UniProtKB/Swiss-Prot annotation:
Source organism (scientific name): Lactobacillus helveticus (strain DPC 4571)
Lineage: Bacteria, Bacillati, Bacillota, Bacilli, Lactobacillales
PANTHER family reported for this sequence: ATP SYNTHASE DELTA/EPSILON CHAIN, ATP SYNTHASE EPSILON CHAIN, CHLOROPLASTIC
Keywords from the named record: ATP synthesis, Cell membrane, CF(1), Hydrogen ion transport, Ion transport, Membrane, Transport
Cellular component, GO, one term: proton-transporting ATP synthase complex
Oligomeric form and interacting partners: F-type ATPases have 2 components, CF(1) - the catalytic core - and CF(0) - the membrane proton channel. CF(1) has five subunits: alpha(3), beta(3), gamma(1), delta(1), epsilon(1). CF(0) has three main subunits: a, b and c.
Protein name, UniProt field: ATP synthase epsilon chain
GO molecular function list: ATP binding; proton-transporting ATP synthase activity, rotational mechanism
Amino acid sequence: MADPEKLFRVDVVTPNGMIYSHRGSIVDVRAIDGERSIMYNHVPLLTPLVISEVKVKRSREMDSRIDHIAISGGYIEFSNNVATIIADSAERARNIDISRAQAAKERAEKRLKEAREKHDERTLERAEVALRRAMNRISVYNTKGH
């Protein structure tokens, strides 16, 4: 059985409130400078995150449950064995509505095409971000094995 002293709290917070709060042995995130794996007693850290998947391994066992969370960027702060992820939006894989995510992808692709035709750089950038968010949600949903 896992030693509870080697687990730390992982919280994911959005403007809408707490999305996730559990104890974990490892949290994997994608920072702007690459992948990071954080474990118990990691050095204090504050770093920006990109649109990506957060993975939280719930115990130290090899076959431990892994929770998958889609985030739309944000920050991770780790200190005193508490990892806090602050994101504009976040969704656990089990809560993702795949039909809504696919519809968002289609809307973003349509806006992207229109922006390219009109040479509208501002709309193009926003459509690219919307597409990355939708693709991330779909990817996280599929990672869970649905």
